[in-house]
Amino acid sequence: MTREEAIARDLKRNVWTVMGLPFDCTTEQETTDHLIDAMLKEERCFFTTPNLNFAITAQNDSQFRDSVINSDWVVADGMPLIWIAKTLGIPLPERVAGSSVFERVRQEYKNPDRPIRVVFFGGPDGTAAEAFKKIAVDNSSMEVVGFYSPGFGSMDEMSDPEIIKQINQTDADLLIVALGAKRGQQWIELNRKQLDVPVISHLGAVINFVAGTVKRAPVWIQRSGLEWLWRIWEESSLFKRYWHDGRAFIWQYLTKIRPYKNLMQKQSQLPQIPLEFSFLNDSNTLQISGDAVHRNLSDLRSALIELIEEERIKVIDLKGLSRLDGSFIALLQLVQKQINISGHSLKLINLDSVHLQQFEYACVSDQFTIIQHPSPVDDVSLAPTQS
């Protein structure tokens, strides 16, 4: 895939920001089909499945957060995230659990002449080997072509070129990492450019579920949002994590989600204004005015794709903005991501107090360089990002 194709694919995604992270608006079936297609076409896909704990942790860990933004496909693997989305009018259709997607791939892909090749990296000692045995006898069109248990080594030790070489030699289609969410995402970010495996994902629970060392909750419990109780019953060590997440969720609701909903309701009463944008070549500034909401973003996406491909955009001026939604915020996150990949940085200017508050409620105000009232002496040049 060319750089131009990668930019276009990323910015055309239907993504919405929830708790500071951009989520693809997709279903479990669509995700399954997308991953199978990527594996068969050998197209790179970094697949990430944040749950509530993931989202809360990401708010205080920029490296962890960026691993989600840098992903190619992001799904909401937790009912609390779906509840938050519905509260804010964000159309995430359903929870998409990574372990459920893996099972769908096992059950729905039927081509024994071209099996999907999987390699496991991580997990408790012996668990990956047991998962290998289970998959080997289930007569599915999937085969495990390697499993590695790096133990508790350092990131450098787990990223040794010899380990990467061994993984690449498996000729796998899917790499499942199980190192704990933060370490797993960090390891993927550090090594994915050197890995030849097209689809890579941290799915820590999958190895345990396949091996049978941990039982998955019944479907009705998963859909009710009470899977955390089942997980505590199965793994008592998770109690502290869920206790922390529960407290953080209540605080988020009181200080971010409820005020965000109230603000969105007030904005919904404003008259609708068409989205307009223009580009100033002399300052490489894109000016946006009107309603930056999902239904109006198609032409803007096309313009942004062209500007990023040509490395012309350095500033987005939001002075004339009337209202915005989670789709526009997510688009800005992807725009900044692609500009950073090109070695440059993005600045947002003239964001008024209402929209700045909306950025705060959406947990993204610290993700952007925002200049409220730029003066002629402000440096808004397209400067290289700091590594």
Would you name each region that the model predicts?
Residues 2-100:
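N-terminal nucleotide/polyanion-binding subdomain common to many enzyme families
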Residues 85-162, 166, 170:
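Conserved beta-alpha
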Residues 149-156, 196-232:
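Short, flexible loop segments at boundaries between secondary-structure elements
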Residues 260-322, 334-387:
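STAS-like cytosolic regulatory interaction modules
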Residues 51-54, 179-184, 206, 320-321:
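Short glycine-rich anion-binding loops that position phosphate/pyrophosphate groups of nucleotides
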Residues 80-87, 216-217, 221-265:
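A transmembrane-helix-recognition feature enriched in membrane-embedded lipid enzymes
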Residues 132, 185-194, 331-335:
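Short Gly/Thr/Asp-enriched flexible loops that form oxyanion-binding sites at enzyme active sites
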